[in-house]
Each structure stands twice: as C-alpha cells, then as structure tokens.
C-alpha cells in the first residue's frame, strides 16, 4: 500500500495593484503572510511531506468523471491513480494495474491489478471499483464531459447511453450502463474490457484522469457533494485531501 500524504496546494492571484493601493500596513501584512506561507511550503518540501503548486482558479469539481478543466485535472492526478500512467519519458507504465494484455484482434484488453490496493479510508480497492467507475462514465445521468471520448469505443456503449438518435441526440431506449462491456473478475484481481473496434491507443486512454476510480459507496451515499469535503473525499492516489478552503488552497 502506498503511503498517503496530504496535499498542500496553494492558490495565488495577481494582487499587486490592489495591495499597493491599500497602504503600507496592508502591504506589510500581505508580505508577512506570503513569507509565512512560503516558509511552510519550503519546510514541507524539505521534509518530504508535501509540495506547493499554483493552480489558478478554484477547481469547479474534483470528481474525475465530471472534470473537464486543467485546474481540476492538476489536482486530480495527484490524489487519484488510474489503471495506467504515463511517465516522464512519455511511456505508458503500470498504475493500479501491474500488467495488461491485448488480444490479437485488438478487441479485448485485460488488466491485472496490483496486490494490496487501498482507498484513502483504508478499505480495499479492486477491479470492481474500476468496473463501476467506467460504467458511471457511460451513464447519461452522470453527464461526464469526456464520457464518449474515453469509453465510447467500449462495446455496449450505445446501449449504455440509451441509443441516442444521431440527428437529435435524444435517447431512443432506456439507458442500461450495465451493457458496457467492462467486467471485473469475481476475486477483483482482473478487469476485462471488450472494444467495438481496435483502439491501439487505449492504453493511453486508460491513463487519462477521467478514468480514475471513484468509490461507489461514497458517491451513492453523498451524491455530488462527495468530492467537496475532506471527510467524504475518498481517493486512491499518493496524496489525499485534508483541507479545502475555497478559492484559497487545497
């Protein structure tokens, strides 16, 4: 199990002009606060307990399925881990999956999960969590902005999304996201995905932030608010959220 660390992500704005107009007292206070923040960040980095990243605006969402912005993605990639990762050499490597195989016809991808995977609350994470998360991406009720992009090539996608009319986009049948051909083994050790057509870059899709797993019980219990509070924010990456002050820091 990977050691969970707390994220200290500072959000800063360009306030120079405003501070100058506020007089020496405000400037002195701002400088003191800035120095204190910098000192804390430096100490955390030096001890190996954290790092500071300027993100920009407050993330609209930290739900991997719903995010479509860079500011959210920059945080998501530190607190979640998908099946695969792309390393510094632009090579696809194992993430939550230790290995993967592709059938000769390119239609079946099988991922073998690492042993001992855990959620940030200490509960077991298995291939079944990825099955749920991928089907959630296809569920029209989720309205995932990248849903079609990342799971649209998986067999059963049309049925999962209600066979939308090509001209109007209106659903013509009742959505059945269980029709999506993603299946976890009974022991949760392997995840098998059947595609409608060969997709040679599906390994890179499997490394996309939107393909990160979410914990079913947490999402279903808390609804959309699950990813807005540290006490309900369950993740699986190397870092976890301990504090979120909107428009200030995470």
Language model region names:
Residues 131, 145-217:
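Surface-exposed binding/hinge segments that line
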Residues 98-149, 192:
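Aromatic- and charge-enriched surface segment that lines or borders ligand/interaction sites
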Residues 3-24:
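Sec-dependent N-terminal signal peptides of Gram-positive bacterial secreted proteins and lipoproteins
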Residues 22-34:
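Bacterial lipoprotein signal-peptidase II cleavage site
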Residues 177, 195-250:
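Gly/Pro-rich hinge or "lid" segments in bacterial periplasmic/extracellular proteins
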Residues 47-57, 108-111, 130-133, 191-193, ...:
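Short, well-ordered beta-strand elements
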Residues 35-52:
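Immediate post-signal peptide segment of exported/extracytoplasmic ligand-binding proteins
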Residues 54-104, 234-235:
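N-terminal lobe/hinge region of extracytoplasmic solute-binding protein
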């Amino acid at each position: 199990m990977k050691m969970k660390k707390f994220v200290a992500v500072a959000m800063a704005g360009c306030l120079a002009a405003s501070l100058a107009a506020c007089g020496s007292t405000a400037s002195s206070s701002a400088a003191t606060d800035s120095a204190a923040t910098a000192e804390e960040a430096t100490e955390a980095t030096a001890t190996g307990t954290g790092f500071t990243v300027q993100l920009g605006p407050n993330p609209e969402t930290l739900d991997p399925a719903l995010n479509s912005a860079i500011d959210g993605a920059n945080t998501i990639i530190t607190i979640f881990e998908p099946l695969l990762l792309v390393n510094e050499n632009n090579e696809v490597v194992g993430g939550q999956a230790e290995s993967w195989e592709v059938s000769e016809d390119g239609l079946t991808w099988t991922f073998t999960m690492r042993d001992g995977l855990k959620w940030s609350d200490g509960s077991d994470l298995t291939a079944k969590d990825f099955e749920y998360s991928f089907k959630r991406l296809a569920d029209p009720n989720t309205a995932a902005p990248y849903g079609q992009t990342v799971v649209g090539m998986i067999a059963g996608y049309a049925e999962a999304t209600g066979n939308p009319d090509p001209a109007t986009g209106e659903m013509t049948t009742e959505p059945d996201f269980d029709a999506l051909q993603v299946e976890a083994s009974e022991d949760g050790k392997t995840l098998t995905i059947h595609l409608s057509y060969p997709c040679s870059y599906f390994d890179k899709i499997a490394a996309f932030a939107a393909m990160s797993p979410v914990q079913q019980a947490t999402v279903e219990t808390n609804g959309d608010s699950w990813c807005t509070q540290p006490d309900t924010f369950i993740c699986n990456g190397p870092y976890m959220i301990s504090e979120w002050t909107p428009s200030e820091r995470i």
